[in-house]
Amino acid sequence: MITAAPRELRQLPLYHDIDIRGPETEVATIFENIYQPWGREQFVRATAPVIRFDDVPEEWRGKAGGIEIVHLGPVDQECDPGLVKAFPDALIGLTPQGFMREWPNNGKVQAIEWLGARELLPRVSALVLSAEDLPKSPRGQEMLQEFIELCPIVAYTQGPRGCTIFHGGQATRVPAYPAQEIDPTGAGDVFATAYLLHLRKTGDPIEAACFANAAAACNIEKPGATGVPTLSEVEARLRLTPLD
């Protein structure tokens, strides 16, 4: 993992077996999520520095680095798009929400145009984004269509309605799996990670979406990071009948 975060966060037991690189900082990026009947309100309370190409360890770069999968996951404009150049042979996954938001009024997050999409997306293997990442105006759907034209695989997540996979000129709806929701925070991150892992394993964008939907369903049934499921939990969820 490459991140910009304080030492105390890197030393949490949750990360004891993860190789964490990147600059140690005084503050971490902090969000506050408030879930309302009409959707999520989000606020930025603190921001960490930008992560740049030079923060990638030299031994991880290029063909010699042997990195097979990269998940570029900006949350608040903190990832330099040039990071993808360090991994020329990897499957590159992108969750772009951090490129598509600003927080001008008291830290309240709002959707904006992603001006760098046309340059970055042709270098990306799979794009994962949610309905919440896009503007609610008609421009939101226009942006989605532009992304579909620029990236070979787009996974558009829609919460309890599952997701739609855009690939090869086709749109395939993949239903969600049953779940008793306790905490939806982080479900998108779990979906994206599971999707990229299974896409790398199978090469099948639709099969990967089924796997990722099952992982996300498991995740929302527990609070916080405790909800990250095991492989056996995901496989058990896959044996259930998806929601129609």
Q: Where does each model-flagged region fall?
A:
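A short, aliphatic-rich alpha-helical micro-motif
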Residues: 64-65, 121-122, 148
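Short, acidic/turn-prone active-site loops that include or flank metal/cofactor-
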Residues: 25-26, 96-100, 177-180
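Conserved beta-alpha-beta core of the PfkB/ribokinase-like small-molecule kinase fold
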Residues: 69-144, 161-162
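A polyampholytic, Gly/Pro-enriched intrinsically disordered region
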Residues: 40-49, 111-123, 174
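Conserved N-terminal subdomain of the carbohydrate kinase-like
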Residues: 1-73, 77-78, 83-93, 236-244
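Short, charged, surface-exposed secondary-structure boundary motifs
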Residues: 29-34, 101-107, 181-185
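A structural micro-motif
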Residues: 18, 67, 90-91, 124, ...
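Conserved phosphate-binding/catalytic region of the ribokinase-like
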Residues: 140-244
